[in-house]
Amino acid sequence: MLENLSTEHRNEKTMNLDEMNIKEVLQSMNEEDRTVALAVEKEIEHIEKVVRVVIQSFEEEGRLIYIGAGTSGRLGILDAVECPPTFGTDDKMVQGFIAGGLKAFTKAVEGAEDREELAEEDLKSIGLNEKDTVIGIAASGRTPYVIGGLKYANSVGASTASISCNKNAEISKYAKLNVEVETGAEILTGSTRLKAGTAQKLVLNMISTASMIGVGKVYKNLMVDVQSTNEKLVERSKRIIVEATGVSYEVAAEHYEKAERNVKAAIVMVLLQCEYGEALEKLKQAKGFVKKAL
């Protein structure tokens, strides 16, 4: 029942939202947004458990799969598509599915979120297996598409987790791990693209970033697996080598090219004064962790 969900309640502070001037609306939104990070903080221990499971999946060559509808689905896809350029993953390692398919990313597909079987079809299409982790995302915590996906994931032995913005969410019953960030009433009643969406984005940022750190995609606080897909990222790659090694920009650029634009290898080459092949071998032995390779 929607009336029992805190995300559907009316916000007592914004009953006269339509009478506020623009500045008052913005101040109200900002005031409410300040509460989101605090709500996420209360769920850190649960988020940590999810990260550990995701790392285990990655170590076993499994995948992280997000499923959601509407804003929740879009946020999952957004997090997934940022992983290849940021962490050098292939596009299968982290994937996002939205009820109604990719066309639903830009235009609502009526009724798609109400069909459990659509999620099962989506997960079957990628050969979901016991090495994978499926995270169901739903602000309300009751979306049938997400429930169907979690049911199927459990049936094949995959790890499962849920992210919702209501306590005792329905989807929590179908996932082994639960993150329930209680964001409360929105300034615009029921518009969960606001605080609830912000909370989900923060949690997804945490899960993907911490998991990638856990499998060696980061050295110190540098994204050493960044893929140089444009000029900005080429420059960033060279700057990362400078920051990691302390050499001049020119020396960093030289090693970047010698390492065939592999930032990790370039760092190892500089710090260990070795050739590209040796750097690759050391990284392989260290399972991709730069610190261990050194």
From Swiss-Prot:
EC number assigned by the record: 4.2.1.126
Record Pfam families: GKRP_SIS_N
SUPFAM superfamilies: SIS domain (SSF53697)
Keyword entries, A-Z: Carbohydrate metabolism, Lyase
GO BP term (any one): peptidoglycan turnover
Spans through the membrane: none
Active site: E82, E113
InterPro entries: Etherase_MurQ, Glucokinase_regulatory_CS, MURQ/GCKR, SIS_dom, SIS_dom_sf
Protein's UniProt keywords contain Lyase: yes
Domain SIS positions: 54-217
Coiled-coil spans in chain: none
Protein family per UniProt: Belongs to the GCKR-like family. MurNAc-6-P etherase subfamily.
NCBIfam families: N-acetylmuramic acid 6-phosphate etherase, PRK05441.1, PRK12570.1
Additional comment: A lyase-type mechanism (elimination/hydration) is suggested for the cleavage of the lactyl ether bond of MurNAc 6-phosphate, with the formation of an alpha,beta-unsaturated aldehyde intermediate with (E)-stereochemistry, followed by the syn addition of water to give product.
HAMAP family: MurQ
Protein function: Specifically catalyzes the cleavage of the D-lactyl ether substituent of MurNAc 6-phosphate, producing GlcNAc 6-phosphate and D-lactate.
Protein name: N-acetylmuramic acid 6-phosphate etherase
Gene: murQ
